[in-house]
């Protein structure tokens, strides 16, 4: 059963099925939409089935592994495999992409191309999470950028070309560092290139060289995460992109950067990570405060939510930097948690825009009476974003706190200072999120406008909102469901460190 190429099928299926849509006769936008949704649902069911029957949670080693010779000339292999670190992100990718496709129903212009790009992005993201070969990881990383650029450049606001150009300059520029790191690591210390991640995990390097590799990978993943000061592409991109694209960006794309930090920087380069972790922790703490302070000054609704994403990614960076079992588990839980919360907030921001055609918060107000369902869902998900107890964000941030407290690597005074600054950031978070809700839904601005009337959530939008809310509450009540997937892998990664 395990010899069956599950992962190859899971990676190749979305882009292959999407390609058929481009060559088949155009049957109307509705056919394209339902075809894409059926592909996404089938892919998600296939992934879930493959993992349920073949993945063993108590095994930290690579499972469902596939190893095929691909290009003889380069001695290049198609290596796939999953472990506790990648299974959660792959399932998150399937879930969010399916809902984003359903959210994209209002898109009518170039519908075939739009849905093909979403499916191509789907393949690239799953390929990145399941690659066990460093060069294959890089190829999948780059494959995923092209659909994102086109989705940004062709569908969105008035400044979409500017934001798409900024996105590609940042990400393509950072990919140069990723490629240099991949080639450097693969060519070091052997006559033949070594690209197998399992072999590279046992490789040791001179200190200076390991630091150089670490910095190269860190720059690449810092842009994607994003880590300040390499975050400035994110608010512009979210501000202009169609909200279904924003769901994919916030829900999955940002998580690829955090995944790369754990998979490559932390697992392959433990000595350099141990040296850089105090600085990363300081940067993560500053990021929480900076984003929480900058967000209230944003007039654009989606830009304000984008800065909340930057703030939440700070907790992931701190968890990764703590080099402890609770810290890293908390970071992985926050990756999954914010994937749901970020996607949900952008979806609700987009549905609000579909009704009032306004993007600036100071022009909104008084919508709560007319659209009570959207108001209720937005309020609940804002509470999830500010880490209300019972929601997934609360337990993730709490575990990260425990990770800092239990870390033996840092002095007590340093830990107290970090926790104090993080606490200030957590106080600022409700201020900008509740202020955002107040500006949107309370007051009388739109009610006093002549001919003011718009409809509340329909069945599709309500289904989408509830579908994302269920896992947020589910993880908040029973986080062990997610934590149990990665716990053995986390212990395996931390066994390379002297602190734990």
From Swiss-Prot:
Recorded catalytic activity of this chain's protein: a plastoquinone + NADH + (n+1) H(+)(in) = a plastoquinol + NAD(+) + n H(+)(out); a plastoquinone + NADPH + (n+1) H(+)(in) = a plastoquinol + NADP(+) + n H(+)(out)
Membrane topology of this protein: Multi-pass membrane protein
EC number per UniProt: 7.1.1.-
GO CC annotations on file: chloroplast thylakoid membrane
Keyword annotations of the record: Chloroplast, Membrane, NAD, NADP, Plastid, Plastoquinone, Quinone, Thylakoid, Translocase, Transmembrane, Transmembrane helix
Membrane-spanning residues: 4-24, 35-55, 87-107, 113-130, 134-154, 167-187, 211-231, 242-262, 272-292, 305-325, 330-350, 364-384, 386-406, 411-431, 462-482
A Gene Ontology biological process term: electron transport coupled proton transport
Residues of the signal peptide: none
GO MF terms held by the record: NADH dehydrogenase (ubiquinone) activity; ubiquinone binding
Compartments, as annotated in UniProt: Plastid, Chloroplast thylakoid membrane
Family annotation (PANTHER family): NAD(P)H-QUINONE OXIDOREDUCTASE CHAIN 4, CHLOROPLASTIC (PTHR43507:SF21), NADH-UBIQUINONE OXIDOREDUCTASE CHAIN 4 (PTHR43507)
HAMAP family documented for this protein: NDH1_NuoM (MF_00491)
Family according to the record: Belongs to the complex I subunit 4 family.
Protein name from the UniProt record: NAD(P)H-quinone oxidoreductase chain 4, chloroplastic
Record lineage: Eukaryota, Viridiplantae, Streptophyta, Embryophyta, Tracheophyta
UniProt gene name: ndhD
């Amino acid at each position: 059963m395990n010899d069956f190429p599950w992962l190859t099928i899971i990676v190749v299926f979305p882009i292959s099925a999407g390609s058929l849509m481009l060559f088949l006769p155009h049957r109307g936008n509705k056919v394209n939409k339902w075809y894409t949704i059926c592909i996404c649902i089938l892919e998600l069911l296939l992934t879930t089935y493959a993992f349920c029957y073949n993945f063993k949670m108590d095994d930290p080693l690579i499972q469902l592994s596939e190893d095929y010779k691909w290009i003889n000339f380069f001695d290049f292999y198609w290596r796939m495999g999953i472990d506790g670190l990648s299974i959660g992100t792959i399932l998150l990718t399937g879930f969010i992409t399916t809902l984003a496709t359903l959210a994209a129903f209002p898109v009518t212009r170039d519908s075939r191309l739009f849905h093909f790009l979403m499916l191509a992005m789907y393949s690239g993201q799953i390929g990145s999470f399941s690659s066990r070969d460093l060069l294959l990881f890089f190829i999948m990383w780059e494959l995923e950028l092209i659909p994102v650029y086109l989705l940004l450049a062709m569908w969105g606001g008035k400044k979409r070309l500017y934001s798409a150009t900024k996105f590609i300059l940042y990400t393509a520029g950072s990919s140069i560092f990723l490629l240099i790191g991949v080639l450097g690591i693969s060519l070091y210390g052997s006559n033949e290139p070594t690209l197998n991640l399992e072999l590279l995990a046992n490789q040791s390097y001179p200190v200076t060289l390991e630091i150089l590799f670490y910095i190269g990978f860190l720059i690449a993943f810092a842009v994607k995460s994003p880590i300040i000061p390499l975050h400035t592409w994110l608010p512009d991109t979210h501000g202009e992109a169609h909200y279904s694209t924003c769901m994919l960006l916030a829900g999955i794309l940002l998580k690829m950067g955090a995944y790369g930090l754990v998979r490559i920087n932390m697992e392959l380069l433990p000595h350099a990570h141990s040296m850089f972790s105090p600085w990363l922790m300081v940067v993560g703490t500053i990021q929480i405060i900076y984003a929480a302070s900058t967000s209230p000054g944003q007039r654009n609704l989606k830009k304000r939510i984008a800065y909340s994403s930057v703030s939440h990614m700070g907790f992931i960076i701190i968890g990764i930097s703590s080099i402890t079992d609770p810290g890293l588990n908390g970071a992985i839980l926050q990756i999954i948690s914010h994937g749901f919360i970020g996607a949900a907030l952008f979806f609700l921001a987009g549905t609000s825009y579909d009704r009032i055609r306004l993007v600036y918060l100071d022009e909104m107000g008084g919508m709560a009476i007319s659209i009570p369902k959207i108001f209720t869902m937005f309020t609940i998900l804002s509470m999830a974003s500010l880490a209300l107890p019972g929601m997934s964000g609360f337990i993730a941030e709490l575990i990260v706190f425990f990770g800092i407290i239990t870390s033996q690597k840092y002095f007590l005074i340093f830990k107290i200072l970090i926790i104090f600054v993080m606490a200030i950031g957590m106080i600022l978070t409700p201020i900008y999120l509740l202020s955002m809700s107040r500006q949107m839904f309370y007051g009388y601005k739109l009610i006093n406008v002549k001919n003011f009337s718009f409809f509340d959530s329909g069945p599709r939008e309500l289904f989408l909102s509830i579908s994302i809310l269920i896992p947020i509450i589910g993880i908040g009540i029973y986080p062990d469901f997610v934590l149990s997937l990665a716990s053995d892998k986390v212990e395996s990664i931390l066994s390379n460190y002297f602190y734990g």
